[in-house]
Amino acid sequence: MDIVTNKIVVEKYNFETTMEENQPFENKIELEVHEVEPVDGNVELMAKGKIFKITIPFLLALENFRIDGRISRIIQLKDFFGQFSDLEAADVEALSNPLIDYIKRITYDVTEIAFDEPGVSLDFNANHDG
């Protein structure tokens, strides 16, 4: 599959070491996908394949800190004119992994600086159940 990717955008990244006790947090990392419509009726661009905005909103509460945010990227799937849900799980994972890697990288760097010790390495496993 031929893919044109734009830069990854960190829409929001929040890091907190002060957490209120007994405040329950549900760790979550989600995948949101929205079809992008062309601006100014750019039909030529759309004729090359569907364009999607992939967004990963997340909230993770770990032992010493909490992070939350949104990271996104716009992609075009060349010669693909179906729905995003038509893609195989492996393709969806390949399209979303660079965003997950960004969350890991930012978190490692921020925790390394904040705690003045080696950063925290996050480990995510894909959930193909929905």
State the predicted function of each range.
Residues 1-97, 113-130:
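N-terminal intrinsically disordered, cationic/polar leader segments
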Residues 100, 104-107:
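Helix-rich interaction surfaces within compact, conserved domain-sized segments
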